[in-house]
UniProtKB/Swiss-Prot annotation:
This is NADH-quinone oxidoreductase subunit C 2. Its main location: membrane. It comes from Rhizobium etli (strain CIAT 652). The keyword Cell inner membrane applies. Keywords: Cell inner membrane, Cell membrane, Membrane, NAD, Quinone, Translocase, Transport, Ubiquinone.
Length: 187
C-alpha cells in the first residue's frame, strides 16, 4: 500500500496568508476555511498554480448549522489528479446565504451549485442559470434546511403536509424553530 504525498501548503499560505484559515487534515483531506469574498480567487489559484493542479471539482454541498451563526456553509471538495491530493474548502455564509459562483473556474460547478441552491437556498452570485434542479419551479422552500417540516408543506401534490402561519425568525435562545413556510430569496 503506497502512502499518498502530502499537500505543499507553502504556496497557499504565501499567497493567502491570514485571509484564510488552515484547518489541518481530516480523514486524509486537507481542509481550509475561506471567506466568501475570496472563494473564486482561492479556487482559481488551486486549479491554475503549477504546484497545485486541482483540476477536478468533486462536489459542492450545502450545510445548515442551525442554530449556529453563521448558519450556512458551502463546502467544496477538490482533487488534484497529477498530485493525488484532496482538499476540502469550507465557506461559512450568512443568512440569506450567498457566495460567488465558481462556474468560471470549473464548468461542472454549474450543476453542483444548482443542487445547493435547490436544497439549501444558497445563492451563487454570477451563476449562469441558477434554477431548481430536483424540485419543480413552483416548489416553496428548501427541503434540506433544518427548519423545513419533515412532512413538507400541504399543497395539491402533498395533502398530508404541514399547515401553519407564515414563519418568524428562529429564536436562537430557545432553539424554537418556526413551523410555517420559510421565506425564499427573490429571484
Amino acid at each position: 500500500m503506497s502512502v499518498e504525498p502530502s499537500l505543499n501548503r507553502a504556496p497557499i499560505m504565501e499567497r493567502f496568508g491570514d485571509t484564510i484559515e488552515d484547518l489541518g487534515t481530516a480523514h486524509g483531506i486537507d481542509v481550509f476555511a475561506v471567506p466568501p469574498e475570496r472563494i473564486v480567487e482561492f479556487c482559481r489559484f488551486l486549479k491554475e498554480h503549477p504546484a497545485m493542479q486541482f483540476n477536478f471539482l468533486s462536489d459542492i454541498c450545502g450545510v445548515d448549522h442551525y442554530p449556529e451563526t453563521p448558519r450556512f456553509e458551502a463546502v467544496y471538495h477538490l482533487y488534484s489528479l497529477p498530485n493525488r491530493w484532496r482538499v476540502r474548502i469550507k465557506c461559512r455564509l450568512g443568512d440569506p446565504p450567498e457566495v460567488p459562483s465558481v462556474t468560471g473556474v470549473w464548468r461542472t460547478a454549474n450543476w453542483h451549485e444548482r443542487e445547493a441552491w435547490d436544497m439549501y437556498g444558497i445563492r451563487f452570485a454570477g451563476h449562469p442559470d441558477l434554477r431548481r434542479i430536483y424540485m419543480w419551479e413552483g416548489f416553496e422552500g428548501f427541503p434540506q434546511r433544518k427548519d423545513f417540516p419533515l412532512r413538507g408543506y400541504k399543497d395539491k401534490l402533498n395533502p398530508f403536509g404541514a399547515e401553519g402561519p407564515p414563519p418568524t425568525q428562529p429564536d436562537l435562545a430557545t432553539r424554537d424553530i418556526p413551523q410555517g413556510r420559510p421565506s425564499t430569496p427573490e429571484s
